[in-house]
């Protein structure tokens, strides 16, 4: 099922329960960094519902009291780490609607999520269907279908350009990046700074790459 259809079905269910109240973005490590853009989008643009993020284990062991049938939990893990599978089960048990973002339909995430979004995660990579892109698409659809968001059409149109932009950026930036890396490789400390929608990228760069 496409993300657009998933959100349409979710909205129909929520409309019978009083509407959407809160969206939880749950993951750990690189997956948590990857879904951050969707969180930031909703925190910035949503008017009638709110959004927060949790690490998988925190969500399981310090489950928010607000979590109930009027909530959506977007939970992400490429290969379905045990604590993230448990996070999906925790949200299900509280009556929330779960969207499991994962690497294939064969993972433990796919088996327990009420809805499943399989994102591109290999070579060749489709960046318009990456975990980052899918988290944003979920956010765009929620804003559009629940609040009539006026930037929806432009956001959807932009997806067709993502792969081209990434390919061009790789070609243009790689030589400079390699030169910088060679120059700075012996530095004892690297400070990685970011804000806004780029925070997740900086988190991933700091923890996974440096």
Tell me what each language-model feature is.
Residues 1-22, 123-124, 140-209:
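Active-site phosphate/pyrophosphate-binding segments
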Residues 19-152, 158, 195:
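Glycine-rich phosphate-binding loops that contact phosphosugars or nucleotide phosphates
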């Amino acid at each position: 099922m496409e993300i657009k259809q998933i959100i349409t079905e979710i909205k129909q269910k929520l409309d019978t329960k009083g509407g959407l109240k809160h969206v939880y973005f749950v993951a750990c490590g690189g997956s948590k960094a990857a879904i951050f853009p969707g969180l930031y989008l909703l925190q910035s643009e949503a008017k009638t519902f709110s959004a927060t993020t949790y690490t998988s284990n925190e969500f399981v062991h310090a489950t928010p009291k607000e979590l109930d049938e009027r909530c959506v939990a977007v939970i992400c893990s490429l290969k379905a780490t045990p604590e993230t599978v448990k996070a999906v089960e925790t949200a299900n048990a509280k009556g929330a609607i779960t969207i499991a973002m994962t690497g294939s339909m064969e993972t433990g995430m796919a088996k327990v999520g009420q809805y499943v979004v399989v994102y591109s995660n290999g070579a060749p990579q489709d960046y318009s269907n990456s975990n980052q892109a899918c988290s944003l698409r979920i956010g765009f659809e929620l804003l559009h279908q629940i609040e009539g968001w006026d930037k929806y059409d432009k956001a959807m149109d932009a997806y067709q350009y993502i792969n081209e932009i990434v390919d061009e950026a790789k070609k243009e930036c790689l030589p400079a990046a390699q030169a910088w890396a060679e120059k700075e490789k012996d530095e004892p400390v690297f400070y990685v700074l970011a804000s806004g929608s780029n925070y997740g990228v900086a988190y991933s760069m700091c923890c996974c790459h440096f």
